[in-house]
A protein has these predicted regions:
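Short, well-ordered turn and helix-capping elements at secondary-structure junctions
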Residues: 69-73, 192, 231, 266-269
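Peripheral, non-transmembrane regulatory/ligand-interaction domains of membrane transport proteins
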Residues: 1-190, 196, 212, 302-308, ...
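Hydrophobic alpha-helical transmembrane segments
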Residues: 113-116, 184-204, 221-236
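A beta-strand-loop signature enriched in Asp, Gly, Thr, and Trp
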Residues: 199-202, 206-207, 213, 244
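General secondary-structure edge motif
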Residues: 121, 158, 165, 200, ...
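The cytosolic transmitter module of two-component sensor histidine kinases
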Residues: 157-160, 199, 206, 239
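Hydrophobic alpha-helical transmembrane segments and their immediately adjacent juxtamembrane loops
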Residues: 211-322
Length: 322
């Protein structure tokens, strides 16, 4: 598998469009083909890291830059984590990709006729294309957490925990992606010996865009931690209410158990045991004790769940303000 692209009229075109006479500006190779053209040990060592790299990076090897770009899983281009190698010089960009991430990006750049002037400009445009939908994705994730927060505040502890964890994992993947890509963009923006001044400015602008996305991501991660903490607090409140009910039930049953156990011993000459109305008196005593305990617990507010009490207090506060 090999794809060749050229820059003509400041746009990217496929080599099949009448530009076969000139050397290609962009090459897409698989790992076996790239290993065949790797002329130095440093490049071969970098290519060996491609299958298991987790963070984007770039290194300067002679008169070119070599690195790996790692896109998080779940991107629109691939459901799995996408990786591709980069070999960049002033006159050529070689992309090492065993999948279709690079060919998809390059095809979209050519279809949209995105302005590019050099191989480094093509790489920068590809990275921007990877980031195109991230602002909208971060907005959707924030809307998800706002919905989770609203459900929790309404007292609904049964929310979609799977969706919450999926959003948290997505944010974690974006964090790693932004860190690595920001370092890569910073390194290339400062390499004036390899890149043209216009390309250095493009990568500097890309680095600033990543900084803005990183700050937005950081605030969103803080918000997600608050929602997770609120969710855990609601679980704790629910557990405390269950334990409160169990304590109340056990407290009500304790004197009744004592009375029934006392009369169950069947000792001679026990109070009320030999009179015809004794059973009725004992039953009435048990009912009176149970009612007295229920009234006592109700006045203390122990027979209401905490969330319900808070709701009633909020309603009373609203009525008072009215």
């Amino acid at each position: 598998m090999q794809r060749e692209w050229s820059i003509a009229g400041n746009v990217l075109v496929s080599r099949g469009e009448g530009h076969d006479a000139q050397a290609p500006d962009v090459l897409v190779l698989d790992t076996d083909e790239a290993a065949g053209i790797a002329s130095d040990h440093a490049t071969r060592d970098l290519l060996s890291q491609l299958p298991h790299a987790e963070l984007s990076f770039v290194e300067h090897i002679g008169e070119r830059a070599a690195g790996i770009v790692v896109a998080p899983a779940g991107e629109r281009l691939s459901r799995r984590q996408g990786r591709f190698g980069v070999l960049l010089s002033r006159s050529e960009l070689v992309l090492v990709d065993d999948g279709d991430v690079c060919t998809t990006l390059l095809g979209q750049l050519a279809e949209e006729r995105v302005p590019v002037e050099s191989p480094a400009g093509v790489l920068c445009a590809m990275l921007r294309l990877l980031l195109r939908e991230h602002p909208a994705t971060l907005s959707r994730v924030r809307e998800d957490f706002e919905r989770f927060e609203a459900l929790i505040l309404e007292g609904r502890t049964r929310i979609d925990r799977g969706d919450m964890m999926a959003d948290a994992r997505r944010l974690l993947g974006f964090d790693t992606f932004y860190q690595g890509l920001s370092d890569l963009a910073d390194d290339l923006s400062e390499d004036e010996a390899l890149l043209f001044p216009a390309d250095c400015e493009r990568f500097a602008a890309l680095s600033r865009q990543l900084d803005r996305l990183g700050m937005r991501l950081e605030s969103l991660q803080d918000y997600s931690l608050q929602v997770h903490s609120l969710y855990q607090e609601s679980i704790d409140v629910r557990q405390n209410n269950v334990m409160q009910w169990l304590t109340v039930v056990a407290t009500i049953a304790l004197p009744l158990t004592f009375i029934t156990g006392w009369f169950g011993m069947n000792f001679p000459n026990m109070l009320l045991i030999n009179v015809p109305w004794g059973y009725a008196v004992a039953a009435a005593l048990c009912v009176a004790l149970a009612v007295a305990e229920i009234v006592f617990f109700h006045r203390r507010g122990w027979l209401s769940f905490g969330m319900s009490r808070r709701k009633r207090r909020g309603q009373h506060g609203t009525d008072r303000h009215r």
